[in-house]
Amino acid sequence: MLILGLTGSIGMGKSTTSKMFQDEGVPVYDADAAVHALYASGGAAVAPVETAFPGVVVDGAIDRAKLSAQVVGNSEALAKLEAIVHPLVGAHRIGFFEQAKAEGHEIVVLDIPLLFETGGEKRVDKVVVVSAPAEVQRERVLARPEMTPEKFEAILARQTPDADKRARADFVIDTGQGLDHARRQVRDLLTLLRTARSA
């Protein structure tokens, strides 16, 4: 089974591209969604995180703002949180792989926003970077509610620059020319990979 790592900076269209892979029948593992599920009421992270960070659970779920207040800017607290969450996400991901394999899928996608920043490229076979021109990215991001130019710049400062991501990618999906163009690229990429696997 071929594992594709899908990543891209904020506003590049990664979520939309991820959905395009799903529409083509490729299972997609969404790392952010996995963490949300772990933090939700009944999630496996709720009890251990509350033990480590008392007061962060509200109505049976982890309140991300309260957790953030205890963790941001505190590398020791962040390391403690990661020691709880990362193994749970890892177990969740293994379950995803096992199910995809049992269903006979040849290709799966791991949707990981900070793929390069967390060393995730070592866990995948090929890296797909979603990209768009900087002015398109800026326009998309600043159209979001609650977003300011300052917030946008702060987010960019924490992410690997787009040019670096593209240079390290095996494949690039350009979303700057519209959805149909991006969808064609996704289909062409899957055709290429499936042909290579059956050759």
Curated annotation (Swiss-Prot):
The keyword Nucleotide-binding applies. ATP binds at G11, M12, G13, K14, S15, T16. One of its GO terms (cellular component) is cytoplasm. It catalyses: 3'-dephospho-CoA + ATP = ADP + CoA + H(+). Pathway: Cofactor biosynthesis; coenzyme A biosynthesis; CoA from (R)-pantothenate: step 5/5. It holds the Pfam family CoaE. It is found in: Cytoplasm. The keyword Cytoplasm applies. GO terms for molecular function: ATP binding; dephospho-CoA kinase activity. Its main location: cytoplasm. It is an enzyme of class 2 (transferase). Coiled coil: none annotated. Its EC number is 2.7.1.24. Keywords: ATP-binding, Coenzyme A biosynthesis, Cytoplasm, Kinase, Nucleotide-binding, Transferase. Residues 3-199 form the DPCK domain. GO terms for biological process: coenzyme A biosynthetic process. PANTHER family: BIFUNCTIONAL COENZYME A SYNTHASE-RELATED (PTHR10695:SF46), DEPHOSPHO-COA KINASE-RELATED (PTHR10695). Belongs to the CoaE family. Catalyzes the phosphorylation of the 3'-hydroxyl group of dephosphocoenzyme A to form coenzyme A. This is Dephospho-CoA kinase. It comes from Caulobacter vibrioides (strain ATCC 19089 / CIP 103742 / CB 15) (Caulobacter crescentus). The gene is coaE.
